[in-house]
Amino acid sequence: MEMMEEGVPDVINLSYLAEREETELEKRVAEIIKELGAERLMYCMQCGACASICPLARVGFEWYNKKLIKALILGLRDELLDDPTPWACVACNRCTEICPRRVSPFEVMFAMRRLMAEEYAIGSLAIEGLRSLYEYGHAVYMAGREARKKVGLPEKPPSTESDPKALEDLRKILKQTKLAELGLVPME
Protein backbone atom coordinates (compact mmCIF):
# COMPACT_ATOMS: atom_id res chain seq x y z
CA MET A 1 0.00 0.00 0.00
CA GLU A 2 1.43 3.36 -1.01
CA MET A 3 1.58 6.18 1.50
CA MET A 4 0.58 9.82 0.89
CA GLU A 5 2.50 11.04 3.89
CA GLU A 6 4.48 8.98 6.31
CA GLY A 7 2.04 6.73 8.12
CA VAL A 8 -1.03 7.91 6.15
CA PRO A 9 -2.26 5.34 3.60
CA ASP A 10 -3.63 6.50 0.23
CA VAL A 11 -6.61 4.20 0.64
CA ILE A 12 -8.11 2.72 3.75
CA ASN A 13 -9.23 -0.68 2.45
CA LEU A 14 -11.94 -2.13 4.65
CA SER A 15 -13.15 -4.57 2.01
CA TYR A 16 -12.91 -7.38 4.54
CA LEU A 17 -16.09 -5.89 6.08
CA ALA A 18 -18.09 -6.53 2.91
CA GLU A 19 -20.54 -9.39 2.97
CA ARG A 20 -19.94 -10.44 -0.66
CA GLU A 21 -18.10 -13.53 -1.74
CA GLU A 22 -14.71 -12.26 -2.93
CA THR A 23 -14.12 -14.90 -5.59
CA GLU A 24 -17.44 -14.05 -7.26
CA LEU A 25 -16.46 -10.38 -7.40
CA GLU A 26 -13.09 -11.20 -8.89
CA LYS A 27 -14.74 -13.28 -11.61
CA ARG A 28 -17.31 -10.64 -12.41
CA VAL A 29 -15.51 -7.34 -11.77
CA ALA A 30 -15.98 -6.05 -15.34
CA GLU A 31 -19.68 -6.98 -15.29
CA ILE A 32 -20.13 -5.31 -11.90
CA ILE A 33 -18.45 -2.14 -13.12
CA LYS A 34 -20.77 -2.14 -16.15
CA GLU A 35 -23.78 -2.50 -13.82
CA LEU A 36 -22.47 0.44 -11.76
CA GLY A 37 -22.57 2.79 -14.73
CA ALA A 38 -19.73 1.95 -17.13
CA GLU A 39 -21.95 0.37 -19.75
CA ARG A 40 -19.46 0.63 -22.64
CA LEU A 41 -16.42 -0.68 -20.73
CA MET A 42 -15.84 -3.61 -23.09
CA TYR A 43 -15.73 -1.32 -26.15
CA CYS A 44 -12.31 0.02 -25.10
CA MET A 45 -9.62 -0.83 -27.67
CA GLN A 46 -6.76 0.53 -25.52
CA CYS A 47 -5.82 3.21 -28.08
CA GLY A 48 -4.56 5.56 -25.37
CA ALA A 49 -6.40 8.69 -26.50
CA CYS A 50 -7.89 9.10 -23.02
CA ALA A 51 -4.50 8.65 -21.36
CA SER A 52 -2.97 11.33 -23.57
CA ILE A 53 -5.31 13.95 -22.15
CA CYS A 54 -5.86 12.70 -18.57
CA PRO A 55 -4.50 14.93 -15.77
CA LEU A 56 -4.07 11.83 -13.57
CA ALA A 57 -1.78 10.17 -16.12
CA ARG A 58 0.22 13.38 -16.46
CA VAL A 59 0.92 13.66 -12.73
CA GLY A 60 1.80 9.99 -12.29
CA PHE A 61 -1.21 8.19 -10.81
CA GLU A 62 -0.75 4.50 -11.53
CA TRP A 63 -4.24 3.42 -12.59
CA TYR A 64 -5.30 6.33 -14.82
CA ASN A 65 -8.25 5.74 -17.16
CA LYS A 66 -6.70 3.48 -19.85
CA LYS A 67 -4.83 1.28 -17.37
CA LEU A 68 -7.85 1.14 -15.06
CA ILE A 69 -10.07 -0.11 -17.89
CA LYS A 70 -7.55 -2.79 -18.85
CA ALA A 71 -7.19 -3.90 -15.23
CA LEU A 72 -10.97 -4.13 -14.83
CA ILE A 73 -11.29 -6.25 -17.96
CA LEU A 74 -8.52 -8.51 -16.61
CA GLY A 75 -10.29 -8.75 -13.22
CA LEU A 76 -7.50 -7.18 -11.13
CA ARG A 77 -9.94 -6.23 -8.39
CA ASP A 78 -7.64 -6.28 -5.36
CA GLU A 79 -4.94 -4.16 -6.97
CA LEU A 80 -7.55 -1.56 -7.86
CA LEU A 81 -9.19 -1.50 -4.44
CA ASP A 82 -5.89 -0.42 -2.91
CA ASP A 83 -5.29 2.44 -5.35
CA PRO A 84 -6.34 6.10 -4.82
CA THR A 85 -6.63 6.99 -8.51
CA PRO A 86 -10.45 6.76 -8.87
CA TRP A 87 -10.84 9.14 -5.94
CA ALA A 88 -8.39 11.58 -7.53
CA CYS A 89 -10.29 11.91 -10.82
CA VAL A 90 -11.21 15.57 -11.24
CA ALA A 91 -14.18 14.81 -13.52
CA CYS A 92 -12.88 17.05 -16.30
CA ASN A 93 -14.54 14.67 -18.79
CA ARG A 94 -11.79 15.21 -21.39
CA CYS A 95 -11.36 11.44 -21.71
CA THR A 96 -14.99 11.01 -22.72
CA GLU A 97 -14.78 13.79 -25.29
CA ILE A 98 -11.72 12.28 -26.99
CA CYS A 99 -12.66 8.57 -26.86
CA PRO A 100 -13.26 7.27 -30.41
CA ARG A 101 -15.34 4.34 -29.09
CA ARG A 102 -17.52 6.43 -26.72
CA VAL A 103 -16.41 4.27 -23.78
CA SER A 104 -16.70 7.22 -21.37
CA PRO A 105 -13.64 6.52 -19.21
CA PHE A 106 -15.02 9.15 -16.81
CA GLU A 107 -18.01 6.86 -16.14
CA VAL A 108 -15.65 3.92 -15.64
CA MET A 109 -13.76 5.93 -13.03
CA PHE A 110 -16.97 6.80 -11.19
CA ALA A 111 -18.26 3.22 -11.43
CA MET A 112 -14.98 2.16 -9.82
CA ARG A 113 -15.60 4.68 -7.04
CA ARG A 114 -19.02 3.11 -6.50
CA LEU A 115 -17.48 -0.36 -6.27
CA MET A 116 -14.82 0.90 -3.88
CA ALA A 117 -17.47 2.53 -1.68
CA GLU A 118 -19.50 -0.70 -1.65
CA GLU A 119 -16.33 -2.57 -0.69
CA TYR A 120 -15.38 0.02 1.96
CA ALA A 121 -12.11 0.83 0.15
CA ILE A 122 -12.41 4.55 0.61
CA GLY A 123 -9.58 6.77 -0.57
CA SER A 124 -8.00 9.25 1.80
CA LEU A 125 -8.86 11.96 -0.75
CA ALA A 126 -12.53 10.98 -0.46
CA ILE A 127 -12.35 10.87 3.33
CA GLU A 128 -10.86 14.36 3.40
CA GLY A 129 -13.64 15.53 1.08
CA LEU A 130 -16.26 13.94 3.35
CA ARG A 131 -14.71 15.58 6.41
CA SER A 132 -14.89 18.94 4.67
CA LEU A 133 -18.46 18.21 3.56
CA TYR A 134 -19.48 17.45 7.15
CA GLU A 135 -17.62 20.38 8.67
CA TYR A 136 -18.27 23.11 6.08
CA GLY A 137 -20.94 21.77 3.73
CA HIS A 138 -18.49 21.58 0.80
CA ALA A 139 -16.45 18.58 -0.32
CA VAL A 140 -13.73 20.96 -1.44
CA TYR A 141 -12.45 23.58 0.98
CA MET A 142 -13.88 26.98 0.07
CA ALA A 143 -11.02 29.46 0.10
CA GLY A 144 -10.91 32.91 -1.38
CA ARG A 145 -13.16 34.98 0.85
CA GLU A 146 -10.99 38.02 0.23
CA ALA A 147 -11.17 37.47 -3.53
CA ARG A 148 -14.97 37.20 -3.32
CA LYS A 149 -15.15 40.52 -1.48
CA LYS A 150 -12.86 42.22 -4.02
CA VAL A 151 -15.24 41.41 -6.87
CA GLY A 152 -18.32 42.46 -4.93
CA LEU A 153 -19.58 39.05 -3.87
CA PRO A 154 -20.65 38.14 -0.35
CA GLU A 155 -17.80 36.72 1.74
CA LYS A 156 -19.61 33.37 2.00
CA PRO A 157 -21.13 31.70 -1.08
CA PRO A 158 -24.91 31.10 -1.18
CA SER A 159 -24.62 27.52 0.05
CA THR A 160 -24.48 25.61 3.31
CA GLU A 161 -21.59 27.84 4.31
CA SER A 162 -23.94 30.82 4.60
CA ASP A 163 -26.99 28.80 5.70
CA PRO A 164 -26.50 27.20 9.14
CA LYS A 165 -29.83 25.33 8.92
CA ALA A 166 -28.85 23.72 5.60
CA LEU A 167 -25.51 22.68 7.10
CA GLU A 168 -27.31 21.21 10.12
CA ASP A 169 -29.69 19.29 7.79
CA LEU A 170 -26.76 17.99 5.75
CA ARG A 171 -25.03 16.76 8.92
CA LYS A 172 -28.21 14.95 10.00
CA ILE A 173 -28.32 13.16 6.64
CA LEU A 174 -24.64 12.21 6.83
CA LYS A 175 -25.14 10.80 10.33
CA GLN A 176 -27.75 8.40 8.92
CA THR A 177 -25.35 6.86 6.41
CA LYS A 178 -22.89 3.96 6.64
CA LEU A 179 -20.22 6.62 6.90
CA ALA A 180 -21.29 7.33 10.47
CA GLU A 181 -21.07 3.63 11.37
CA LEU A 182 -17.54 3.35 10.03
CA GLY A 183 -16.32 6.30 12.07
CA LEU A 184 -13.93 7.50 9.37
CA VAL A 185 -15.25 11.05 9.66
CA PRO A 186 -15.73 12.46 13.17
CA MET A 187 -19.39 13.43 13.57
CA GLU A 188 -20.26 15.07 16.87
Swiss-Prot record:
4Fe-4S ferredoxin-type domain mapped to chain residues: 34-64, 78-109
Q: What does this protein do?
A: Has oxidoreductase activity. The Hdl and Mvh subunits may together mediate electron transfer from hydrogen to an unidentified electron acceptor on the cytoplasmic side of the membrane.
Alphabetical GO CC annotations of the entry are: cytoplasm; plasma membrane
Is 4Fe-4S among this UniProt entry's keywords? yes
What PANTHER family does the database record attribute to this sequence? IRON-SULFUR-BINDING OXIDOREDUCTASE FADF-RELATED, IRON-SULFUR-BINDING OXIDOREDUCTASE FADF-RELATED-RELATED
Summarize the subunit comment.
The heterodisulfide reductase is composed of three subunits; HdlA, HdlB and HdlC. It forms a complex with the F420-non-reducing hydrogenase (Mvh), which provides the reducing equivalents to the heterodisulfide reductase.
Question: Which Enzyme Commission numbers does its entry carry?
Answer: 1.8.-.-
Q: GO: which molecular function terms? A: 4 iron, 4 sulfur cluster binding; metal ion binding; oxidoreductase activity
Protein location: Cytoplasm
Name-wise, this protein is Heterodisulfide reductase subunit C-like protein
| Protein family according to the UniProt entry | Belongs to the HdrC family.
Query: Which of UniProt's keywords are assigned here?
Result: 4Fe-4S, Cytoplasm, Iron, Iron-sulfur, Metal-binding, Oxidoreductase, Repeat
Residues annotated to bind [4Fe-4S] cluster 1:
C44, C47, C50, C99
Report the gene name.
Answer: hdlC
Q: Which InterPro entries match?
A: 4Fe4S_Fe-S-bd (IPR017896), 4Fe4S_Fe_S_CS (IPR017900), HdrC_iron-sulfur_subunit (IPR051460), Helical_ferredxn (IPR009051)
Annotated [4Fe-4S] cluster 2 binding lies at C54, C89, C92, C95
Record organism: Archaeoglobus profundus (strain DSM 5631 / JCM 9629 / NBRC 100127 / Av18)
